[in-house]
Amino acid sequence: VHKQCLNLHIIKLKTIVNRKTYTFDEAFKASLDYFTGDELAAKVWVNKYALKDAFGNIYEESPVDMHHRLASEIARVEKKYPNPLSEEELFALFDHFRYIVPQGSPMTGIGNDYQIASLSNCFVIGLDGDADSYGAIIRIDEEQVQLMKRRGGVGHDLSHIRPKGSPVKNSALTSTGLVPFMERYSNSTREVAQDGRRGALMLSVSIKHPDSESFIDAKMTEGKVTGANVSVKIDDEFMQAVINGTPYKQQYPIDSSEPTNVKEINAAELWKKIIHNAWKSAEPGVLFWDTILRESVPDSYA
């Protein structure tokens, strides 16, 4: 068995080494024919989705080659299950982007023997349990960087971080709050670039968090948090307080029955600030979180 596996690996390596390569002009010309003269589509496909190695050698002439690669690899997996689709059937589904259009990362990653690539476009990350220690924050930062190196877009929620002024067990005595860590994650995103294209990061926080106003204002200062998009998670209770003109209670931890930090705010004023900032700087985005949970499958998507 080991000898058979070794022989298969040797055959695969020989195939990789001897595989035909194409110049950019050759791939662009073939892709231009494929896309019936659409130069933008041809250029984007060659630059972003054609199979390449770490040195930039191009191994696919047009999307036809890519669709054969996808069909071949998925057919290999299909054989493990009842009623598998054949490579030919799968190719017919992919051909000319007719019925199935994979995301960008799957198009470049599936069947890619030349680079370690992600098979998903986006990842929501974080740590289970109490994850607001400095060590936990650094581990999340490292996970973010590793995912971005593999083309993954990343999102994480900062609602677990202690609000500014909270006591901490180190020489700093009190927490710095959300904003410095927003800047840290943002800087990591700008540092991880591929062909001049930086990573994609979304940061969020619950409106219930006592530092949510600082989060909402973070990008109003020019040059701050430039490597991330930010969105605030709004619950029904907050919107009801806006409509009724009543106070809204913020707390930390946000879902605790015995919070250590509690304050009341004017919900209508904070809502006006969200609208003003979004008008002026296009951020923050808004996630109506209770609605998302109601309308989605919570244990799969939220």
Specify the residue positions occupied by each region the protein language model found:
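Extended catalytic cores of very large enzyme megasubunits
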Residues: 2-302
